[in-house]
Swiss-Prot record:
Annotated localization: Cytoplasm
Region (GAF domain): 1-156
Species name: Clostridium acetobutylicum (strain ATCC 824 / DSM 792 / JCM 1419 / IAM 19013 / LMG 5710 / NBRC 13948 / NRRL B-527 / VKM B-1787 / 2291 / W)
Family, per entry: Belongs to the CodY family.
Tree of life domain: Bacteria
Record-level GO BP terms: negative regulation of DNA-templated transcription
Role played: DNA-binding global transcriptional regulator which is involved in the adaptive response to starvation and acts by directly or indirectly controlling the expression of numerous genes in response to nutrient availability. During rapid exponential growth, CodY is highly active and represses genes whose products allow adaptation to nutrient depletion.
Phylogenetic lineage: Bacteria, Bacillati, Bacillota, Clostridia, Eubacteriales
Residues annotated to bind DNA: 204-223
Name used for this protein in its record: Global transcriptional regulator CodY
Keywords: Cytoplasm, DNA-binding, Repressor, Transcription, Transcription regulation
GN (gene name): codY
């Protein structure tokens, strides 16, 4: 059995898992780093480090202490990555630092490979591989481009999940607002005008007097919103009721009906 086939099967274990749960980008980096014996970084289009893994023996303190903790590559470096429209293999590094051009690099014989991550005809990010002395072979590049495809599919899926989650949030808000009577709707508008941000303390009697409605109208409106899962409320006795917004599309939905 070929070495390439064995390595491909290791990557396939991620694909087999992705049918039931999201792929963790660090998992891809860990496996690819193991089979290719190199550093691996999955970078978003905006330069965010979605996942990474260092090969054994890699000791760049600048990268480990200044770049990785921020989970983001410098914009200048990310622009260079985005300039690569196709796979660039075995790029030799100069004597200067990859991320800080005016500083000298303490490592020699470093080679890197840059693989664009593309999905749905859109640039989604970049797969970056780096190691020392040993060049990446054609088999290595096959695995790298295959991995970039896996990552691209997962980024697209996570984007779709985000879109669906946003749509669900907005739909729940509209349903919750739709259950309110005219007086209850008037009450919640005043309630959330009183809040400082996404949570705060409400004294129902004060709002009732201010708006000219009964306290029960306010209580009913809050119960309906709590039943819909868009807010959380907790009675503090004489102090009032603490309200926390759980659905971050609620205020936006209320503004639209004004």
């Amino acid at each position: 059995m070929s070495i390439l086939l064995n390595k491909t099967r290791k990557l396939n274990t991620i694909l087999q898992k992705s049918g039931t749960e999201p792929v963790i980008f660090d998992d891809i980096c860990n496996i690819l780093s193991e089979v290719l014996e190199c550093n691996v970084y999955v970078v978003s289009r905006k330069g965010k480090i979605l996942g990474n893994n260092f090969s054994s023996g890699f000791e760049c303190e600048k990268l480990k202490k200044e770049i990785i903790p921020t989970k983001k590559f410098p914009d200048s470096y990310n622009l260079k990555l985005l300039d690569c429209k196709e796979t660039k293999a075995n790029l030799k590094h100069t004597e200067f630092c990859t991320f800080y051009e005016n500083e000298k690099c303490e490592f020699e014989n470093k080679v890197s490979t840059i693989v664009p991550i593309i999905g749905n005809r859109e640039r989604l990010g970049t797969l970056v591989l780096a190691r020392f002395t040993k060049k990446f072979t054609d088999d290595d590049l096959v695995l790298a481009e295959y991995s970039a495809t896996i990552v691209g599919l997962e980024i697209l899926r996570s984007k779709n999940d985000e879109i669906e989650a946003e749509a669900r949030k907005r739909a729940v808000v509209q349903l919750a607002i739709g259950t309110l009577s005219y007086s209850e709707l008037e009450a919640v508008e005043h309630i959330f005008n009183e809040l400082d941000g996404n949570e705060g303390l409400l004294v129902a009697s004060k709002i009732a007097d201010k708006v000219g409605i009964t306290r029960s109208v306010i209580v009913n409106a809050l119960r309906k919103f709590e039943s819909a899962g868009v807010i959380e409320s907790r009675s503090l006795g004489m102090k009032g009721t603490h309200i926390k917004i759980l659905n971050d599309r609620l205020l936006e939905g209320l503004k639209k009906i004004k």
